């Protein structure tokens, strides 16, 4: 009986891994030096707040996002001034060593005019995002859409067709709602709206292909503000198309709510092989930088094992066994030290982002967790001998004591990085 149970666990585990970690096939879309889709790493995106009216300030913001690790940065193209600023922002990025085509232009009904009026500025964009729900209205809608697509074809620029819950094509939504009302058992409204999002995205993409845009120049997104809607919509998209998918929870909110919602939805989809590029959209607190969105994207990818961006510091929460005065301070100091050193390590020590460091509070789980990491330190808890055991590659290396345990441990970290990542 026990053997049967063990065999079942092992078989179920293998099956789960086969399902969860198999990426869905998609076309590859090249945006400058970045490739979205195929078997390429999930791409991190962000959007600049902009709107300062100062091109130098806007350029600084885009640069900060790039320096934080955003591989593509979207900016709003909603005025003559906005589109004329694109070449300058691009040049700032190039001068700092970044991808010359990492800027994505995002516009609504006005973007067709701006691209046509300032083509030399639009050529500095790496990709253009258009929303079928507000690209135009009435008889101008299809013409505006086709003008953008033709510009993209002529200049070899990829397009993201981004449908949004808040600006869904009202004619399509009304028709689907009407048709649904005539059914014997109508679907709930939210189901109809989910279907409308997918239909809008796919029909727009197919229309772009009909105009002449190759499939490998198209990325799709369907943004909603609820996690279950996000999962449902993108699961449908993944089943019926091979376009790369841009994931994100729109209007996610701020603080813990926005972080949890975005992390839950994006992680679920990525772990089921759905999604090729991600953006987290949070409402900033006053004075908060949008670079936090980039860091959150990176943390999502690193926490689910899809990409590594930084040395991972593992630590326990602490309990009545630990000495919070020393333990919590050590955790804080190690995290800060790693964050400060990453820019140097990444250039001088390739692969260091795959390293793990464990900082543990007592003997209960400390030694075991430390042995799982590249380097680990197990602090003395209440009632334990006042020494900290250090483990390296699963073996005990030494014990530290005194008032400068942090400085001693940092020296060990630096030595490890220099030996194993060079």
From Swiss-Prot:
Note on cofactor: Binds 1 [4Fe-4S] cluster.
Transmembrane segments: none
GO biological process terms on file: isopentenyl diphosphate biosynthetic process, methylerythritol 4-phosphate pathway; terpenoid biosynthetic process
Enzyme class, broadest EC rank: oxidoreductase
EC number: 1.17.7.3
Keyword flag Oxidoreductase: yes
Catalysed reactions, semicolon-separated: (2E)-4-hydroxy-3-methylbut-2-enyl diphosphate + oxidized [flavodoxin] + H2O + 2 H(+) = 2-C-methyl-D-erythritol 2,4-cyclic diphosphate + reduced [flavodoxin]
Keyword annotations from UniProtKB, A to Z: 4Fe-4S, Iron, Iron-sulfur, Isoprene biosynthesis, Metal-binding, Oxidoreductase
Any GO molecular function: iron ion binding
Pathway the protein takes part in: Isoprenoid biosynthesis; isopentenyl diphosphate biosynthesis via DXP pathway; isopentenyl diphosphate from 1-deoxy-D-xylulose 5-phosphate: step 5/6
Binding site for [4Fe-4S] cluster: 316, 319, 362, 369
Names of required cofactors: [4Fe-4S] cluster
Family of this protein: Belongs to the IspG family.
Function recorded in the entry: Converts 2C-methyl-D-erythritol 2,4-cyclodiphosphate (ME-2,4cPP) into 1-hydroxy-2-methyl-2-(E)-butenyl 4-diphosphate.
Protein name: 4-hydroxy-3-methylbut-2-en-1-yl diphosphate synthase (flavodoxin)
Organism: Ehrlichia ruminantium (strain Welgevonden)
Phylogenetic lineage: Bacteria, Pseudomonadati, Pseudomonadota, Alphaproteobacteria, Rickettsiales
Gene that this polypeptide is encoded by: ispG
